Design a protein with these regions (language model features):
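Charge-rich, low-complexity N-terminal segments
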Residues: 1-98
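Compact, glycine/acidic-enriched structural inserts
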Residues: 101-153
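Sequence-level motif detector for i,i+2 pairs with an aromatic at +2
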Residues: 68-70, 128, 165
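Short small-residue beta-strand/loop micro-motif enriched in glycine and branched aliphatics
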Residues: 98-101, 179-180
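Long, solvent-exposed, polar/charged low-complexity segments
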Residues: 1-46, 142-208
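Short glycine-rich, low-complexity/disordered patches
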Residues: 40-57, 126-140, 204-208
Length: 208
């Protein structure tokens, strides 16, 4: 039975001033939910993709001054980390919930991954129109897939391939006003539906 529901208090964590104060609130309100989602969806990915996936809850351990503007749990088939691999994420900015598949700049094979995506761009374009794409995991901004189909999607994938800092994220952004109204069951279903739509894209990325 799904247990996790997002509240306004969860989103307000990212408006609290001060590193220590925000981290305390994050640890109290948000991280336990990421831990539970980590358990639930690592089992989902392991089952769906046929290899063991591990959850990685963001620790923000390197921060000494600036409080985190977002936080997340990531999923990858590697116990010691996820940033060098294509990975799935569930996370929050103060404005929205994000449910995405990500390739970030630390992935050493991202040029190969980008070529695979370019070769199957039509499959990406068949995803639901309420999906978004982004070229920067450090920014809350994104472009709707419906708009990106024109030329932005190709531009992003070429940048992913050719530019060292190029990144690619795809999935859903759910405004906090909508996310906080979802029941635990509705939220779980939406998250699972989003990831199910992204599984074929993940398989393309990893060459399956």
């Amino acid at each position: 039975m799904p247990k996790i529901k997002w509240t306004n208090k969860d989103f307000k964590v990212f408006t609290i001033d001060g590193l220590e104060q925000r981290m305390d609130a994050l640890n109290l309100h948000v991280r336990p939910k990421f831990n539970q989602l980590g358990e639930d969806f690592s089992a989902f990915f392991s089952s769906q993709l046929g290899e063991e996936f591990f959850p990685h809850v963001a620790k923000h351990a390197r921060r000494t001054v600036n409080p985190p503007k977002d936080s997340w749990v990531a999923f990858a088939p590697y116990k010691r980390g996820y940033k060098s691999l294509p990975h799935f994420q569930i996370g929050l900015w103060h404005t929205h919930l994000f449910i995405v598949l990500a390739i970030i700049y630390e992935a050493p094979q991202k040029n190969v991954m980008a070529e695979r995506l370019l070769a199957h761009k039509s499959l990406i374009e068949q995803l639901p129109d309420d999906f978004i794409v982004s070229g920067d995991h450090m920014s809350p901004e994104a472009v709707s897939l419906e708009v990106a189909k024109e030329d932005k999607l190709k531009e992003m994938l070429i940048r992913l391939r050719d530019v060292k800092k190029g990144e690619f994220l795809i999935g859903r952004h759910i405004p906090k006003e909508q996310a906080t109204k979802l029941t635990a069951s509705e939220l779980h279903q939406l998250t699972e539906d989003t990831f199910n739509s992204l599984l074929p894209i993940y398989n393309i990325i990893v060459g399956k």
